[in-house]
UniProtKB/Swiss-Prot annotation:
Keywords: DNA-binding, Nucleus, Transcription, Transcription regulation. This is Transcription factor bHLH138. PANTHER family: TRANSCRIPTION FACTOR BHLH138-RELATED, TRANSCRIPTION FACTOR BHLH91. One of its GO terms (molecular function) is DNA binding. It comes from Arabidopsis thaliana (Mouse-ear cress). The gene is BHLH138.
């Protein structure tokens, strides 16, 4: 049962009239509910969130996105390195990036010109990100 107060009475009267103030209040309430839902969704996407506050959720999201970007650049580097090794060793690579053949491990700064050029291309590629 709702308690009677002047504030409730005033709100009900304004709500009945469809005044600008009541529409603004309802719009603001919907906006806050939408933000709360979005923060809840973001919090569920972040592994091991620290706290439940909005600021800490955003901060955790920033840290997590930066980690993911770093991981993506490392993986791109490894893929490029593997492709360079496959080209250098005349290994066949199909469209699904499956490598067939055997490879030999060389020192990255060997005197072989192809290995050095491939290393330079890879470093430029990683530096771009």
């Amino acid at each position: 049962m709702e308690r009677y107060t002047k504030k409730n009475e005033r709100f009900k009267a304004e709500e009945g009239k469809g005044s600008k103030k009541s529409r603004t209040f309802l719009t603001e309430r919907e906006r806050r509910a939408l933000f709360n839902d979005r923060f809840f969704d973001l919090k569920n996407l972040i592994p091991n969130p620290t706290k439940g506050g909005e600021a800490s959720i955003v901060q955790d999201g920033i840290v997590y996105i930066n980690e993911l970007q770093r991981l993506v650049s490392e993986l791109k580097y490894l893929v490029e390195k593997k492709k360079c090794g496959a080209r250098h060793n005349n290994i066949e690579v199909d469209n699904k990036n499956t490598i067939y053949g055997t490879s030999k491990i060389e020192h990255p700064f060997s005197k072989n010109k192809n290995t050095f050029n491939c290393l330079i291309r890879t470093l430029r590629f990683v530096h771009h990100f």
